[in-house]
Amino acid sequence: MTSAAPARHVLDPTGKDVYGEIERFRADGPMVRVEMPGGRPAWVVLGYAEAVELLKVRNRNPLVSKDIAHWADFVAGRVPEGWPLLMWAVKAGMFTADPPRHRDLRSWAAPAFTPRRIERLAPVIEQIVADRLDVMATAAAAADGRVMDLRAEFCLPVPIETIGALLGVPDDLAGTFLLGADALFDTAITPDVAQARFGALLGAIETMVDRKVADPGVDLTSDLVKTLGKKDAYTREVLLETVRLTIVAGYETTGNLIDQAVFALLTHPEHLAAVRAGEVSWDAVIDETLRWAGVAGNLPLRFAVKAFELGGAQIQAGDAILVSYVGTGRDPRKFDRPDAFDPTRATRDHLGFGHGTHYCLGAPLAVLEAKVALPALFDRYPGLRLAEDPGTIPANPGFITNGHARLPVHLGTTRA
């Protein structure tokens, strides 16, 4: 296995200018060779059509695999222990599995994400949102109208509390889960910090699973515990990874969706007015946010199982590949005025939840959370506005997801 194509660009681990970076990369085409943290080369897929082609289901003749054994650099020992993206590639579970194993693992967790089960979570989410809005109102009153970080107080708490309810996370472990999930997405922190937080997360998951074995409840973790061993693939190791993946996939990306939708509406008051007038649906806002912001960022990793040509690039067997959901959502060959936030656009096509075999299992839950959270927020705070110039609000550190480090707002008057 060889990987000879040189990297033409460096993928910024801080993610501070993701849109500008993507446009600089795009000048070289829809498939661009980049350098990841630690100097490891990879391809970034920027083109919508190229991403669809790469991600489509090919059970008999796949182009790419999630199995790290296909990565030339890893096999050759060029990826050090503690490399910040390694934890995205080495854990045994749905995220790193290929068919048919992926199908077995997905079916293990799938019953928790049926339309009926998601519908049952609606009142739970509504209560979480209402409670967060009450907490914000109390904090705003005590602070006498000072600036509030909406990301910290609302955008992230809603999904982490929802995932906690889905999994049955005990209150005493919630903080550890939060720090561990953050570490997975922050490509700017040191390997030592990332490893420590990730280790603490795995320890907390082990503790929770042990408690569910002793005293199962009505939650996804307990459902998985009850079916351990019913198939060869249903092992404790995979159970732990399934819980970790549910936390990771359901937390920051959904928080970014809410964050970016609020940001988009506050910076496009004409569209916010149309939503309030009933001329634009919240579904349209959510779909356009997923396209425009690409909240899943640059998602690692896939590996070429053979040489192939895609988007004018010659991919070699053993090459690493990331799909840029920011890039695919702003592909000018697919979308008219790709940089414009416009929930009235005719097409709602986006790859915000992936495509093909690894399409996000929790997509309906993420959409439901946003559909509950966004109208409740804007109804409670009709005068909500940004407290800083939009161009000065920093990006969340890391290139794996796309949100803000903070979302400073003035809440304005509260509607009872």
Question: What name fits each language-model region?
Answer:
Residues 1-416:
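Cytochrome P450
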